[in-house]
Structures are given as C-alpha cells and as structure tokens.
Amino acid sequence: MEAPEYLDLDEIDFSDDISYSVTSLKTIPALCRRCDSQNEDRSVSSSGWNCGVSTLITNPQKPTGIADVYSKFRPVKRVSPLKHQPETLENNENEDQKNNTVEYQKGGETDQGPQPEELSPEDGVGGLPGKGSEPSQALGELEHYDLDMDEILDVPYIKSSQQLAPLTKVTSEKRILGLCTTINGLSAKTCPIASTENSTPNMTPFCVLSPVKSPHLRKAPTALRDQHKLSTEDSESSPALGKCGPAYESENHSKDFLNKVFSDPHSRKIEKSGPDCKLRSFHLQSSAAGAKTEEPINGMNWTNTQGTEERTEYLKKVRSILNIVNEGQISLLPHLAADNLDKIHDENGNNLLHIAASKGHAECLQHLTSLMGEDCLNERNTEQLTPAGLAIKNGQLECVRWMVSETEAIAELSCSKDFPSLIHYAGCYGQEKILLWLLQFMQEQGISLDEVDREGNSAVHVASQHGYLGCIQTLVEYGANVTMQNHAGEKPSQSAERHGHTLCSRYLVVVETCMSLASQVVKLTKQLKEQTVERVTLQSQLQQLLEAQKSEGKSLPSSPSSPSSPASTKSQWKALDTDEESTGKSKVGAQEGIQVLGSLSVSSRARTKGKDEDSDKILRQLLGKEISENVCTQEKLSLEFQDAQASSRNSKKIPLEKRELKLARLRQLMQRSLSESDTDSNNSEDPKNTPVKRADRPRPQPIVESVENVDSAESLHLMIKKHSLASGRRFPFGMKASKSLDGHSPSPTSESSEPDLDSHGPGLGMTPPTQPSTEATQSSPDSTAAQKVATSPKSALKSPSSKRRTSQNSKLRVTFEEPVVQMEQTGLELNGEKDKDKGRAPQRTSESGEQMKRPFGTFRSIMESLSGNQNNNNNYQPASQLKTCTLPLTSLGRKTADAKGNPVSPASKGKNKAAMYSSCIHLPSNALVEEHLRDYARHNDIKRNATKTYHMKHTAEPEPRE
C-alpha cells in the first residue's frame, strides 16, 4: 500500500529517526492493520490512513533514506501534503504501537491542543534523547521543524486539532516502536513495560514535537481524541508517567518533557501517554487485536498526548492569531484561517474584534468583522465592554467611527436595559474627541443625548462623576440637559461635588444658572413677541377703525351745515380718540410734524422758496388775474380744509338738497370771503392756529402770531399748521386733507373760493379739498378746478374724472390763467361733481394741495364756511386738522414744494394725519375754532383786506411772502 511520495514524505516527517522508521518497517503490516482499524475507530478517513500506512511501509523500506527524505521533503510538507502525511505516517509505522501511540497522542494532544506552544518546547527538550542519539537528532530536527512548520506551514493548511492528532498518533507509535527497538533491541516485545512506557513518553513528546504528528492529530477525530483524553486522563495517573520518565536516562529529556507536560494541565495526558506506552509495548508484543484494544487506551493516552499537543498547537495558533491581531497584520490572518475565530478570547475575555478595536486597527477590524460576523460586535469582555466600548476606552476614534456608522454597533448609541450608551463610556473615560464625533453623529441621526442608564445617570452625570470637564463642556455645547436628576436625585453638578470634582461642579452650576436665565429670556422674548403682535394687530385695527370712521365721516349723511350732528361729531371725536390712542404712538410723529410745521414755516419758507417760486409762479398765473379771489380762497381753504374734510366725508351722504343749501350758503360765504378774504384768511388762520396751538401750543402760538402779523404766506403757514389749506406747504398733508375734504366738499365753500382753489389747485393741488370743506360746492369745484389745472381748469371742473386726473397731475400743471372767479363758478357747478368725485378725493387732494397755495380766497370761504359750517368743521376738524396739521408742515414756503410734491405719498399723508389728529385733540372744538375764525374774520377783516392785497402779492410773489 504505497502512497504517493508526498505521502511518503509526510510519513518521513513523522518518523524523524531512521531507526524508528526501521522499527516501524518491521511492524508495518500490523501497523497497517491497526492504522486502518484505528482510522475507522477514530473516524479519520480510512483512505488517508491507508495511504499513510502504505507510505509508512515504503518509508521504513527506505530506513536510511527516511531522515534524508524527511529533510528533503520538509518543503513538500510545507506545501499541502501535510494534510495527507499524518495519515500515512500513522499507518505506515508500527501498526500496533503506532495506532496505540497515535491514539495515545491523540488523547494527549487533544488535551495539549490548547498548549501547543508548551508542547513544542517540551518536545525539543526531552523528546528524543530517551530514544537514542539518532532519535534525539531527529527530534532536534523535529523540534526545529515543529517550531517552523507547525506554527507557520501546518497551520494554514491543516486544522491543528484534526491533523495534529493523527500525526502525533502516528509519530508516537512510530517513535514508540523505534524507541523500543532502539532501546530494547528492535523488538518491542522484549522491552519491559517500564521501558516501553518510558520510550512511549519519549516518543510521545517526540510525536508531539513533529509537525506531522500535530496535523495527524488534527485529522484524527477530535471527538475520539477527547474521549481518549478523558478516559486516559481519568484512568492513567501521574505515577505511570513517572514510571515512564525514570525508566530511561535517555528519556530524561522525555522526563523533562513529561515534567513540563505534568506542570502543564496536560500532565494527565502525559501520564496517560506513559501507561499508554506500557500498553503499547504490550500490544506491540501482542496481537493486532490487543493492539486495537490498546488503541482506545493508547488513543486515550494519545488523545491526552494529542490534547496536549493540540492544545499547545491550538494555543500557539491562538497566540499567534492574537499577536497578529494585536499588531494588525491582516496579511497573516488568511494563513491562520481558523474555523472558530469567534471563539478565540484572551485572558480578559476580549475576542479578536475587541483586540483589533482596542489597538485601533480599523482595517483588521473590518476584515475580522467580515469573517466573524457582526454578532461578535455585541460580545462583552470581563469589563462588560463591547468592541466599540473598548475602542472608546482606548481612544480609537477611527474604529469607533467605522463600527458606529457601518455596523450594528449603532444600536449602542442608545442605552439598553443593562448597559449605558457609547457617550456614557466616552464621558466615563474622558474621550472628548470620540464624544464630539458621537454627539455630531447622534445629532444628525436625531438620537437623544439625554438617555439614562439603569441608575438614571445621563452622560453628563457620568462625565461629572469622573471629573472630565472637557466632556461636560462638549455635552453642554450640544444641548445636553444639565438639570436632570438621576435615581438618587442628584443633578450632574451635585454628583460632581459629591465625587470631589469642584471645578466641574462650579461649571455646571454656572451652566444651570445660564440655562435658567436663558429660559427666562426665551419666555420673555416670546411674551414680547406675542405682545408686539397684539400691539400691531391693535394698531392695524385702530387704523382700520380710523379709516372706517373717516369713510363714515365722508359718507355720513349729516350735512356739514349741521356741524353739531352727533354722528359727525362722534365720528370726529372717535377719530380724535383713536387718533389720541394712535397719537400715543404717533404723538412723536405728530409733535415732530407740528414742530416741523413751526420750523418749516420758517425754514420751509427758505427751503421752499424755489418750490414756492414755482408754485408761486403758478399761483401768480392763476392768481395774477384774481389774486384777491385767491386770497379769499386761501383763507377759505384754511377754514374750508377742515370743513371740507368733515363736509366731504358727510357730503357723500348729504342729500343733494343739503348740498345745494350748503352750496348757496357757501356761495354767500364765498362772496363774503371775497370781500373779507384777507381778514377771513387771517381770522381763519388764527382760530385754526388756536387749535393748532392746542395740538402744539408753543409753536402754533408763535405761528398764529406770525400768521396774523406775518405776510399772508406766513399766515398761510400758520394756517397750514393750524390745519388751514392756505399754505401750499401743507399740500403733501393737504392732499390727504383735500382728498377727504373733497369727499366732504359739497357744502363747505363757495364757488369763488373753489375757483381760487382750482386756480391754486394747479400749484397746490391739495387746497381744493380744503375748500370743499368750507363748502361742498367750492370743494368740488376746487378739486375739479385743480383737476382742470392738470388738463384745463374748466374741463377739470366739469368732469370728475378729469378732476381726478388733474388732481394728480395738477400739482405742477396748475397754471390757471383763467380768473379764479370762473374757477369758483365752475367749482360751484362741479360741487355736485365733487360729490361724485369725493370717492376720487385722493386725486383731488393733490389738486387741493395745489389749491391750498391759493387758499387766500379759500380762507375767506373757510371763514364763511366756518360760520356756516363750523359744526361740520367741528365734526370733521379731526380729519381736516390731521390734514391741516400736515398742511402747516407745508407752509406757504412749501406750497410750491407741495405743489410740486402735491402727490404727497400716503406715508406722509399718514404722518400729516397723525399730526392733524394731535392738533385736533388739542383743538377744543371746531365751534371754538370757528368762533375764533369769525372773530378773526371780523377783527381782522381790515387787516385781511390789507393782507389780501398782501396775500395777493404773496400769491403773485411767494418769495416775498416768505
């Protein structure tokens, strides 16, 4: 049964000694039988054993060449043949003793399996000296070979447990036979039991030493080995080994080996090997059946021997794997391919993943994870740490990154029932960088930072208990809750204090304080926002109410002739109230506007000289022919502005009859005002100034004085400030006023004043509404006139749409060379149109603003309208005053500017309105104003007559007025 040479080579490797091989030659047939039977018993592949037997036979046939062949074929062993070698060697060499020895070694090696390292050195020490010089030499070679081949070559190809066992069995049998023959004289039968035993232990270590043995043992069924180990260990005692040991001095090495084995937990195996050796010698002498019976015993002994060998080999392999993983040498791992990598643990209970992670070998960790499976990532060592936890403890960020982001270890970011989360470990071990990365990752994944462990400790608690301030700061930066209490009722600051970490405790106290303050700030800010929103809504509601009241005032059926009509007065006073409410907010704007009116009355004169020049040129053109009328209209405008606002609001609702009555009234008033335009303008300015004084008393009073004393331009400024439309400077405000006044205009002013306004309208554009306030007829004609100013004064007066267009464009276009009287007449005609155009009032307002530059005549009409429509003025003064307040801002000096800027932006209008409201608030009642206006008209008729000419001059020459 000759096996291939590679098998022979394997066999040769096992039979290190030539003499041993020779002995095996003699016993080859029996050995072959035994090997076959043993192979069957051992569940080792019979084919392998048969091959081994044949090769063994051939090898013994080459007694002298065996050593050479062995040495020659070591490289071959290094190649795959080792797998087959164990089988051939066992079968070829002494069948009986081989089998016995093989089994014996199986038992020993299986026990030794965990101690392969120990076995190898032991083999080197005591292996062959007992056998003889040749065997010892062979053993030396084997030792060398065992160290190199077993650790390096055999491991990759042969499973240490299976192959090593059969190999050791074969070698042990061969060596036992060889030793028996050598020592006892080729015949194992003659050898005493002791000698056999001694030789056997020697051989056993030798067999253990041979790498081929270990692979054979590996090949041998591990179960049988284990059984043999158990039985032999139990049955065989150390004394048997002792017998084996002392039997031979040559075996002193073997004794040493045995002693080593004894010292090792595999001493039992060695002991087993000793009695096995005895049995083996007997069996060698006895029949194959006896040998077979010995096989189980020998096998057990062998198993012990193999157990020791296998253990040593296994331990060697494990240690080598652990070393490789420790060093992160991934390239060496495939050569150590083991079926049970996941069962390899070090003394601390760390599996390979623990080791790789703790050492920071990310690539090795990934490779091992692919080999072992991710389930191993959940294993915990003696410290109850997973590979991820151990990596955190050792600060291996890359490994933590990979495990958390790519494997199931992400589950460890959350606390489990029994174990804390990874950030707990990071805080516990003070790993700030890892903690930072974990927090970032958790933030991205939406994982809570405040999870607690079994004791209710959050990561902040753990970090504070261990005094890692940096970790605490990192956690705080990422929003960890520092006020949480654990199950003991401690906050992190208290835990830090209790553990003596005062710095951390202080920091946490500061953070708690800041957090509480911040929360309060947030609450206050939220409340402030809510209140601000409410305030804004209230303001908007107030504005809506004011607008509604204004529109109601415009649409109020109460005629301006009935100034005391409760609806109009109520609406006015409501507007005033709302204005007052808003004035709280807009007081600043109103006061500023009034102050501006005061200062602007002077400064605007200088500033608006250019504008006034332009507007004055227009006024000159418009007023040049009818300056007296213009003066009257200005006066009327100043009075009518308020009246027109009130009346314009009510005029829409006012029946046509009332409007006609008002128109007739206004015509009379206009006639009066024409005669008394100067005095009316002064008077109207004065009474209006008085309310203006109420609005802004300090400035209005000097303004009033200046109005009376100053040129009609100054009086117009005062008028404007006093809600008089006389001054074109009011026009930006007056436009608004005039718009509302246009709405009210139907009754207030006479046509004459309106034409004046219209004539002024081109320049003032805003006065027409003021005139309408005096008389609806006038206001409408004024607005229409202003509109005409844009297009043609007559056509504008005739068509409300043209009025609207002109009112917008008339500011600069207002150049009515036509007599103002005609304008006023057209205004009377257009009063009805203005009533229609009251909705168009905003457009007219620009015209009225322009007209306001003219309002000298309008002031007359205003005075008249005040006398006739004082009630209306009272009702509508709030609006008119709002507008007039803006008008005073635009004093005569501003008339030109306003004439240019008659299309005052609604914002400025709003401001003007606010100012007017404030002035209205301060104004006692329009009745008082009207009385003042009447008084002024009476007392100042002469002055105004004088000033009419003066106003006419100013209207013709606005600069001189300033």
Curated annotation (Swiss-Prot):
Matches recorded under Pfam families: Ank_2, SNCAIP_SNCA_bd
Domain of life according to the entry: Eukaryota
Basic and acidic residues composition-biased segments: 685-699, 831-840
Positions with biased composition (Polar residues): 772-790
GO cellular component, one term: cytoplasm
Subunit organization: Associates with SNCA, RNF19A and PRKN.
Protein name: Synphilin-1
Source organism per UniProt: Mus musculus (Mouse)
Lineage start: Eukaryota, Metazoa, Chordata, Craniata, Vertebrata
The gene coding this protein: Sncaip
